[in-house]
């Protein structure tokens, strides 16, 4: 999936399942549960032992869009794409990761927490901005940021659950990420 195609698909699906655990088997089982629950965009953080192997395994399924999280630099980005990752997520803004993603035509979503970081990431070529951690004020904060920065594609991945996801989306978020809150 090319970067632009992923952005378009994510704009339709609007939700991803994100797994962070210290057990590869548990990660696979939990992701299967998320998929049974309807998720089609799935993310394995690189902190999971065997994360690249999980990406390879889940990429074999044509009904899924599989990415990696905790991508900290260009090296992680290349290894992720070599394993089959179709999008890259980071907890912080690393311009080498964003550049590598652009060179490979893979969507990047660096972690941001302030409007300044969001603008920096977007200007560096990021396709979306992961909002991490969720700020006090939640959806109202997002609405405030999107007033002067309406083109920023904000995706909160912390503090989102089945009870408030619609509030985040109504505030203008491009999508939301569920970090093991549902499964």
Q: What are the functions of these language-model segments?
A:
Residues 46, 70, 91-93, 112-114, ...:
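Short secondary-structure boundary segments
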Residues 73-119:
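Helix-adjacent hinge/juxtasegments
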Residues 1, 16, 25, 113-119, ...:
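Alpha/beta catalytic cores of nucleotide-metabolism and tRNA/nucleoside-modifying enzymes
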Residues 30, 73-83, 116-124, 141, ...:
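Catalytic cores of alpha/beta
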Residues 87-97, 130-139, 171-183:
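Glycine-rich phosphate-binding active-site loops on the catalytic face of alpha/beta enzymes
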Residues 39-44, 81-83, 102-104, 114, ...:
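Glycine/Thr-rich beta-alpha phosphate-binding loop at enzyme active sites
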Residues 1-86, 103, 151-154, 162-163:
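Conserved N-terminal beta1-alpha1 strand-loop-helix module at the mouth
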